[in-house]
Amino acid sequence: MHCDALLKLYETQGKIQFKEAIELETNMERLKKGKVKVQAFAVFIYPEIKAEQKFQVALDQIHYFYTDVLGNNPNMKLIKEWTDIETLQEDEIGALLTLEGVDAIGNDIKKFSILYQLGVRSVGLTWNNANLAADGAQEKRGAGLTSFGEEIVAFNNEHKMFTDVSHLCEKAFWDVMNVAKYPIASHSNSRAIM
């Protein structure tokens, strides 16, 4: 469900194309061959990017989502509503824009709203590290959801967006499960099978 194609397109500044770039683990040709019906495209910001640059890096990746992934592949269709999946034609593939870690927005819910307006419909609060929303799986402190994280989940609930529990520490996972109406685990493992 999850792929890092947008990060690679951003890193190469558009020198590779989503349609058939062999450098991408996920490209249009591979999606067709695998008969994939919906693909999630993650916007990811490396932790070492300066705080004041993170939102712009997110916007740049979204630019490649619209100009290359959707713009150069007419059979890719933007998924903004649940019904968009149901109305996909046989030869179409849905493209779901996601955010992996909310570091790009700092503590500004208005920036989060802008990302929603640009098409983001699934949000992972962290990427292994701690941020202003929650602690990630590699944060030794293991604290849960912050009040800002609760605000993000409330926004997700109101707008029928997925809250992705991938990369969260255990306490943050359970905090999200207690308040999220639309939780998912897009790329996670279970601790046990019962």
PLM segments and residue spans:
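N-terminal hydrophobic targeting/anchoring segments and the immediately downstream early-domain regions
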Residues: M1-L125, A130-G142, T146-S147, I193
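Histidine-centered active-site/metal-ligand motif
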Residues: H2, H167, H187
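Active-site glycine- and acidic-residue-rich loops that bind
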Residues: V102-G106, M161-L168, S190-M194
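Histidine/acidic residue-rich metal-binding segments in metalloenzymes
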Residues: I109-Q117, E139-I184
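Acidic, glycine-rich loop-and-beta core segments that form the ion-binding/anion-interacting portion
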Residues: K181-Y182, H187-I193
